[in-house]
């Protein structure tokens, strides 16, 4: 009897690993029609419901206040959201997968690579390697974990039309992977405006609920905001829209444990302080994007094909720099 209970507990533990399908709520006494309404509104996992504020559920047609409270109460039972000891949290952190960048020096700087379950922002001028790093990561995330990969698919949202599948094939060849398999494992979408960019995240959520993804790339997260909103009069609306987009990205990272990589552009500082600054460029998006990204990397040009990556902001990495190179087969180490 005790053994049976032990196996049941193990099975439950296994089921609780990773995102749980929204249909799980039906077993908790939630009406199937209500579950369907949640799914139609973009909630594909129990985690998505548990992390959502009640106000968001009340916006769904046919969900009353009483229903919303019951749904949230049941979701909270399935998703651990209370306090935990720092020991347990430390244990969970030690199991986080890092995705290799293709450059040993860069991986050493990042203490393993791009962290899953959080947002990494890369910013810099044009030709500093942002898009090339994204292309390399879209392949390395498919590698087995013992080879510095994430054993999952990649999702690529392109806002500037700079995605090139032939770059992925060159990187795949370097790692001895089948080119056609690598391309099949990358879901690509071109975003045409800021609303479309946000809409694509709802589709991303549905796809992640069905298949194992390790990485979500948005290149560039801010380019369309610079054109869709102009002047100071629209600044407040732009920042609110951007904040909502970044919040959705963070929720996807929390919900599915994917690594989210966003690229950002820089703007020249034209105020009085610019003449005293060593480098008068700063990332756009202001404080909103600064607070949303967990790790911020500043990329700049070196000599020839070499580039320099600096940790600009991170909760646990020291401020340091590393050199890498952009080669024909993706990002690699700089040759001395």
UniProtKB/Swiss-Prot annotation:
InterPro entries: AAA+_ATPase (IPR003593), DNA_recomb/repair_Rad51 (IPR011941), DNA_recomb/repair_Rad51_C (IPR013632), DNA_recomb/repair_RecA-like (IPR016467), DNA_repair_Rad51/TF_NusA_a-hlx (IPR010995), P-loop_NTPase (IPR027417), RecA_ATP-bd (IPR020588), RecA_monomer-monomer_interface (IPR020587). Residues 45-74 form the HhH domain. GO terms for cellular component: chromosome; condensed nuclear chromosome; cytoplasm; nuclear chromosome; nucleus. One of its GO terms (molecular function) is ATP binding. Disulfide bonds: none annotated. A motif (Nuclear export signal) lies at residues 242-257. CDD domains: Rad51. Belongs to the RecA family. RAD51 subfamily. This is DNA repair protein RAD51 homolog B. It comes from Xenopus laevis (African clawed frog). The gene is rad51-b.
